[in-house]
Amino acid sequence: MIFIPVMKEFFDIVVIGGGHAGCEAAAVAARMGAKTALVTMDSEQIGAMSCNPAIGGLGKGHLVREIDAWDGLMPHAADYAAIHYRMLNRSKGSAVQGPRIQADRNRYKKAIQTALKEQAHLTIIEGMAESFQMDKGKVKAVLLADGRPLKTESVVLTTGTFLDAWLFCGEKKWRGGRIGEQPSIGLAEQLKALDLPLGRLKTGTPARLDGRTIDWARLQRQPSDEDAWTMASYGAGRVAPQIACSLTRSNQKTHDIIRAGLDRSPLFSGAIEGRGPRYCPSIEDKIMKFGDRDGHQIFLEPEGLDTPLIYPNGISTSLPEDVQQAFINSIEGLENTKIVQFGYAVEYEFIDPRSLTHQLELKALKSVFCAGQINGTTGYEEAAAQGLVAGISAACAVAGKAPPVFDRRNSYIGVMIDDLVLQGVTEPYRMLTARAEYRLGLRADNAVTRLSGQAKAFGALGAEMTDFVTKRLAEREKCQKLLEKAASSRDMQAVGANVTEGASHSLFEWLRFPAVTRQHLEALIPELTEFSDAVVSEIIDDGRYAPYLERQDAELARLAGHDNMPLPAELDYATIAGLSNEMVEKFSAARPPDMASASRVRGVTPAALAAILIHAKKVTL
């Protein structure tokens, strides 16, 4: 509900900001029984997708599934809004596959708003959070711009890109946290006055195109996946009509137009000081850094079923409007395309995440938790996952109990938080599978098994999810029990498996052999056909990955004992398998002489250290 009058009641938790982080924080805190208020400048913009109309992707899809394991909002809203499903990295193993959906913006926002309005213990309040009321170094209330105080002793800050924010398009610069919306100035000033470590980052968005003016017949179509996977582990499934996306490319003419306009770009004129996201660079950055390429992919993504708007993924820009129009019209299929809204950049304040605990609580200001872009991250999924953790942590603090543990072994959420609070950021942080050294066990398909038991114990699941998790975990245990049955190689050969191993193994252990398929198991245990596809597929993947998990754990255990191992001065980090471009850049610049020095390079991940150790051992043998 919307609560408007003067506030006289006390809230256990006040969440500031109605973006993806704020929505998850407010929802989980309320599910856990905390009396929660969600403060937003405009209730109609709650859950808005500010940039690309998509959820998931490589690494990001894992986060969404982990949010689902805690009964979060994002996965169900994604399925309600999904107009295009695509499993990324499908040709690779399930550990690094990335579920991604294209969303109808309005349907997504509607799903989030409906879920929040129906959530018990949650009040939605329209207003601008201006400052904290403090007493002896502790927050006692959140003061709104119109003078209303919201009494509370626990706050979750999810200000997104609104904190002391500026918008840029060419030579134009104006105040705003998002197009058409005001920034948060008062709160930014108070955070500065509290002497918190702040910095500035930048992000951007491309122009929005009129799809009726695109020559679709000349473009490569990309249909939705036909198999029926979804983002949420339970629910109504795919409910919206599925439509195709299309693909085009920039060309040399496009690049020449962009180069000619760079002197009017705020990215290169010095107007923008904050660093932008490495893994979602502007088209200006692409042309400057990869000028030798003859073209860059551009995915034309519909913004919804009832709108002609198209999101051109791959050409984020803050170039002047005339340059944007010219370079877009130089692209195949877009020669006559009209721009409905020009691209722009936003620069905003963030808090150095090293000032946070692993519960995302400010060390210097107890009971104030931070989530999302205020912590130096980029992306809806990263924000939502942090919001989930901040909401859980705040609710646990209110209840006087220890919070759950998200660590590098049990979740991508734990990897992200560990990276943030220990290493900090020099650019907007994006989740990648390469950041997780235990990624072989952190598959998107086993998030419920990994995390939902803990979520249930903390009272974070609604009634439907509680029932689903109880049944799913029981079904999995029963299925796993069946696969303990022993079978000889002769048994396996009798059902068509091409194996030569002479020993007898459990059926689960036989899954280590690529020649053994689900059909072979069902021939030996017909009862397997009675189990859900999700459970059987998950356990089969467990079996497939078992030997690799053993090897992974052994390598990581050995890592601790190799601090003094020298690293060749001429080591080519670009040739190391599993090392991201970001890590290649950091290590190539630092040139650490040994593994101990490598571990102290800012931003290094345990996964990167493991990859370097494995490579170094090979080249020194």
UniProtKB/Swiss-Prot annotation:
The keyword Flavoprotein applies. GO terms for molecular function: flavin adenine dinucleotide binding. It is found in: Cytoplasm. Its main location: cytoplasm. NAD(+) binds at residues 276-290. It comes from the Bacteria. PANTHER family: GLUCOSE INHIBITED DIVISION PROTEIN A, PROTEIN MTO1 HOMOLOG, MITOCHONDRIAL. NAD-binding protein involved in the addition of a carboxymethylaminomethyl (cmnm) group at the wobble position (U34) of certain tRNAs, forming tRNA-cmnm(5)s(2)U34. NCBIfam families: mnmG_gidA (TIGR00136). Homodimer. Heterotetramer of two MnmE and two MnmG subunits. This is tRNA uridine 5-carboxymethylaminomethyl modification enzyme MnmG. It comes from Zymomonas mobilis subsp. mobilis (strain ATCC 31821 / ZM4 / CP4).
